[in-house]
């Protein structure tokens, strides 16, 4: 016995629905989902995309005074001096340098939140804008974020 095409197609969908209606609804739903997904925040591409918070930079300033100012001034980490060494270098390199070598009298003693706060302070001193999400100690992600100053 041969089943007419119309009956075969209707048996795939729920009873009472036409096959084209089901396909159209699915296609429209998929399109709307893609459209909504594209409306979300875009991933940051550099340190100019607000990868730290102002509160984090403020905390970093206090940590800099406590742990770093004995040997360093913030000018060493800002402007042309910073750019000459760190321009286009991934943020992960700065994280690693601070985490593994500072402070000089106790290298490696700073925790992740302290290191990222110090980085936020350095970014702030270089005019890199703050954002709404704190900088996290995610080295894989930081490895994709080049350090750039405004005007670069």
Protein language model features and the residues they cover:
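Electrostatic cytochrome c docking/interface patches
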Residues: 40-62, 106
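The canonical Cys-X-X-Cys-His
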Residues: 60, 64-74, 118, 122
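Bacterial N-terminal signal peptides that target proteins for export
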Residues: 18-28
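Flexible coil segments in periplasmic/lumen-exposed cytochrome c-class electron-transfer proteins
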Residues: 110-152
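C-terminal motif of bacterial Sec signal peptides marking the signal peptidase cleavage site
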Residues: 36-38
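Electron-transfer interface patches adjacent to heme c in soluble/periplasmic c-type cytochromes
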Residues: 77-96, 103-116, 134, 149-151
């Amino acid at each position: 016995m041969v089943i007419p095409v119309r009956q075969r197609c209707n048996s795939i969908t729920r009873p009472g629905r036409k096959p084209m209606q089901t396909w159209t609804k699915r296609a429209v739903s998929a399109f709307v989902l893609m459209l909504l997904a594209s409306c979300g925040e875009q991933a940051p591409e550099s340190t100019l995309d607000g990868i730290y918070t102002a509160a984090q930079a403020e905390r970093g300033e206090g940590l800099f005074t406590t742990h770093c100012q004995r040997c360093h001034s913030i000018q060493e980490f800002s402007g042309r001096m910073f750019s000459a060494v760190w321009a286009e270098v991934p943020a992960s390199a700065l994280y690693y340098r601070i985490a593994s070598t500072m402070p000089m009298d106790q290298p490696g003693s700073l925790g992740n939140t302290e290191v990222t706060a110090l980085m936020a302070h350095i970014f702030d001193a270089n005019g890199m804008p703050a954002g709404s999400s704190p900088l996290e100690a995610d080295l894989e992600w930081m490895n994709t974020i080049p350090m750039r100053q405004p005007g670069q």
